[in-house]
Amino acid sequence: MRFIDEAVVTVKAGDGGNGIASFRREKYVPRGGPDGGDGGKGGDVYVIAEDNTNTLVDYRYTRRHDAMRAENGHSRNCSGKGSDDLFLPVPIGTTIVDTETDEVLGDLIEIGQTLLIAKGGDGGLGNTHFKSSTNQAPRKATSGFEGELKVLKFELKVVADVGLIGLPNAGKSTFIRQVSAARPKVADYPFTTLVPNLGVVDIGRHRSFVMADIPGLIEGASEGAGLGIRFLKHVARTRRLLHLVDIKPIDGSDPVENARIILNELDRFSPELANLPQILVLNKIDQVPEEELNELCTHIVAELGWTGIVFRTATLTGEGVDAIKYHLMNEIEREREREIEDPIFAEAQKARFERLEAEVRLNTEAQREAYRAARKAAREGTDLSDDDFDGSDDDDDGVEVIYAP
C-alpha cells in the first residue's frame, strides 16, 4: 500500500429538505387548514479515527465526499426524513486543516475519536408555521438550508513516543528491528527507508511505547535536499528524539560533522523541534577496535559539546539496545504520570505540542511554496536552483508502510 500522508479533500454536508405548503383534505372537515411538514435536516460530515488504516491513499483518488440531501416535508404535518451523517475514516494521528483559513479544526489521536467537519443544512419550514389569525390558509413554505461546503487538508503524522533521527545508514532501521516487531527494509545504501516505520516496543507487564523510524536526513534537508523535510513532520508528536550517529562511517566521513548536520537541520527547520529532549546514541561500536572505542566516543561527545544522555550500541548485534529501551520506557512513564497528576504540566505539554505542530506546518508549507516557485522559474528559463523535494501530488513512491504490533 502506498504511504500517503497528505490529501486535499472537498466535503459537502447534506442540504436540508424543503418545507411544503399543503392543506388538510378530509371528509367532513371543510377548510382543514395548513398541514405542510418541515423538511428534514441534511447529514453532517464527520471524520473518525480508525486503527485499521495507516495511509490517506484513498483520499488521494477520491477527493469529493458529499452527504445526502434530506427529504422534503410531507402533508399531515409530517416532517421529511433527515439524511444520514457521513463518516470518513482516517488513520490515528490525522490533523484536519481548513485550507481557506489555515485553521486547525482538530486532531484525531484516539481510536474512535470523531470530529465534525461540515454541518448539514436545517430543513425548511412547512406552511403550518405561517398560520395566523389573519391568514388561516398560508401558502408560504421555506426552502431548506444548504449544507456546508469545505475544502480541507488531511495531514497524517504518525503517533509515536520516540522518533529516530540520523543520517542515512546510521542504523535506525536496524535499531527498530531489534526493539520491536517492525521489519523495515535494511540495506547498505542510503535512503533504504523511504517512509516512516512504526514499531511497538514491548517491555512486558503491559509496558510499551511506540517508536518511529524516520527516513534519513542529509545536509540541506531543511531546504529540500534528499527527501527534504517531507517526513520530518512525523516527529512533531514525539516525546523524545533518539539521535543515532554512526561512529565509523563506511565513507570515512567525520561522525562529529555528521551529527552536527542533523542538529543544524533540525534547528533550521524548527527550533521548537530541536528543543525536544534528545538522546545521543553512538552506534556501530562493534566496528571499532576495543582499545580505540572509549577514546573515539569521548572525542565525539566532547567535540559536540553534548551534555545530555549518551548511549553506545551495536544495533546489528543488539549490544546496548536493551539499556536504551528500559531508559526510554522509564522516562516516558514518568512523563505520563506527571501529566496525569499535574494539570499545569499537562497544559504546558499540550501548548508545546501545539506550538511545535504549528511551526512544522508553517515551515513545511513555506518550503513547498519555494519549491513551486523554483520549478516555475525553471520552466520560464530563470536560472534558479532546483531540488528533490516535490510538494505536488505526483511525487509519491509506490512503497509500503510497516506498522507492526
UniProtKB/Swiss-Prot annotation:
User: Gene name?
Assistant: obg
Q: Which family does it belong to?
A: Belongs to the TRAFAC class OBG-HflX-like GTPase superfamily. OBG GTPase family.
Keyword tags: Cytoplasm, GTP-binding, Hydrolase, Magnesium, Metal-binding, Nucleotide-binding
Q: GO CC: one term?
A: cytoplasm
Q: Subcellular localization, per the record?
A: Cytoplasm
Q: Which residues cross the membrane?
A: none
Q: Where does this protein hold Mg(2+)?
A: 173, 193
Which portions of the chain have biased composition (kind: Basic and acidic residues)? 371-382
Where does the record place the OBG-type G domain?
Answer: 160-333
Q: Where is this region: Disordered?
A: 371-405
SUPFAM superfamilies linked: Obg GTP-binding protein N-terminal domain (SSF82051), P-loop containing nucleoside triphosphate hydrolases (SSF52540)
Could you give a single Gene Ontology term from the biological process aspect? ribosome biogenesis
Co-factor(s): Mg(2+)
Enzyme class of the recorded protein, top EC level: hydrolase
Q: How does this polypeptide assemble, per the annotation?
A: Monomer.
Q: What is this protein called?
A: GTPase Obg
Q: Which Pfam families match?
A: GTP1_OBG, MMR_HSR1
Organism the protein comes from: Psychrobacter arcticus (strain DSM 17307 / VKM B-2377 / 273-4)
Q: What is the lineage of its organism?
A: Bacteria, Pseudomonadati, Pseudomonadota, Gammaproteobacteria, Moraxellales
Q: Any idea which GO molecular function terms this record carries?
A: GTP binding; GTPase activity; magnesium ion binding
